[in-house]
């Protein structure tokens, strides 16, 4: 039995504390289970042991009908997923071999199955620091159990960052919204940013033009010193949400412009990279290869690519590849909440913050 995860060597936990307890919050983006034997096997149980300081705090099991449904649903959802979808969800186009997906819990030689975006939120008196994946199966009427131990860690940024816009902003798509950016490998900790008008409305009339939005045209700032390693400046469209229609634009312009509009990728020290998307066409003030300084204006907030209103899509990654590198939490040094209290990370969806 071969067991792999697509969260590389560890899973990122975003813990929070309160009332003497710790809430651990992490996602296993992909679990791959492959029958690497020469005989058929039957899956009996897939379980997850959540551990804190070597002690099992909670166990989650897929058995019986739940396991059968899990395998069948995985086959139906991912057997025809595009290479772009595989990159978005798992950070790799080769993590799974789609032609070898099993249709049931009976796995023939070289057949494989998996789990997509298993979310864990656990409240305990200490942080969860290890996930143990256990796979129990039958082969020739004998029961076997294989396991994989995965560290669960709290990630700390390697550099100091400022917020990519100034003033008061509404943020959404945060990591604790499990149905937005978080299922995607590089976008797990992505943030969308926009602004309300004086009446605290994002949309305040019908058929609004881009210029009617408070955020449109705002300066976008480099969050730290670095080198521009990729950018696009001439995409003028709002891409359709229909995949078949968007594929035409991908073939013409490339995946990233069709997805994110005009964008900038900056490589900072220690191989952390920031990404800024949906910018106004021809508003970029930098070019590939330029060295930028923290706080430098790199372009204007716009409404291009896969976007439903003017906003900035921002994310931090462990490399420059939107379809291959891992999303990272980003902590900011110049943020306050609406009460004036200093905060470092956006821990709630639809949070209003002020960047000094």
Predicted regions and their residues:
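Polar/charged, compositionally biased leader and regulatory segments
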Residues: 1-224, 339-356
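Short glycine/proline-centered loop/turn elements that form peptide/ligand docking sites
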Residues: 2-4, 285-288, 303-310
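Short, small/polar residue-rich loop motifs at catalytic or cofactor-binding pockets
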Residues: 214-216, 259-260, 284-285
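Zn2+-dependent peptidoglycan hydrolase active-site motif and core
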Residues: 225-280
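Conserved positions in beta-strands of structured domains
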Residues: 227-229, 302, 317
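Acidic, glycine-rich catalytic/binding loops that coordinate metals and/or anionic ligands
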Residues: 247-250, 290, 315-356
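Short histidine-centered loop motifs in beta-beta connectors
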Residues: 272-295
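Short hydrophobic beta/alpha edge segments that flank linear recognition/processing sites
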Residues: 292-305
């Amino acid at each position: 039995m071969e067991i792999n995860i697509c969260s590389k060597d560890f899973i990122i936990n975003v813990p929070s504390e309160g009332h003497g307890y710790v809430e651990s919050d992490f996602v296993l983006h992909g679990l791959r289970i492959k029958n690497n034997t020469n005989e058929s096997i039957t899956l009996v149980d897939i379980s997850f042991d959540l551990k804190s300081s070597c002690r099992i705090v909670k166990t989650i099991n897929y058995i019986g009908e739940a396991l059968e449904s899990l395998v069948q649903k995985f086959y139906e959802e991912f057997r025809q997923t595009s290479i772009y979808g595989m990159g978005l969800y798992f950070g790799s186009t080769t993590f799974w071999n789609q032609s070898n997906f099993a249709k049931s819990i009976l796995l023939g030689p070289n057949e494989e199955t998996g789990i997509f975006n298993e979310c864990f939120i656990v409240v305990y008196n200490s942080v969860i620091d290890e996930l143990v994946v256990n796979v129990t199966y039958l082969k020739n009427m004998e029961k076997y159990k294989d396991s994989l131990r995965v560290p669960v860690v709290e990630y700390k940024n390697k550099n100091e960052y400022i917020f990519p816009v100034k003033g008061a902003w509404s943020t959404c798509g945060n990591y604790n919204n499990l149905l937005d950016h978080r299922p995607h490998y590089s976008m797990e900790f992505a943030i969308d940013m926009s602004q309300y008008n004086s009446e605290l409305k994002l949309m305040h009339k019908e058929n609004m033009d881009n210029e009617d939005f408070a955020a449109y045209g705002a300066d976008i700032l480099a969050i730290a010193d670095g080198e521009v390693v990729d950018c696009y400046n001439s995409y003028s469209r709002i891409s359709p949400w229909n995949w078949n229609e968007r594929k035409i634009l991908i073939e013409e312009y490339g995946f990233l412009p069709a997805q994110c509009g005009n964008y900038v990728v900056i490589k900072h020290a220690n191989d952390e990279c920031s990404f800024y998307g949906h910018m106004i066409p021809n508003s970029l003030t930098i070019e590939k290869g330029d060295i930028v300084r923290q706080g430098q204006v790199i372009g204007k907030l716009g409404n291009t690519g896969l976007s439903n209103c003017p906003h900035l899509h921002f994310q931090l990654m462990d490399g420059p590849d939107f379809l291959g590198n891992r999303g990272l939490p980003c902590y900011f040094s110049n943020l306050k909440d609406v009460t004036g209290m200093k905060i470092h990370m956006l821990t709630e969806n639809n949070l209003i913050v002020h960047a000094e």
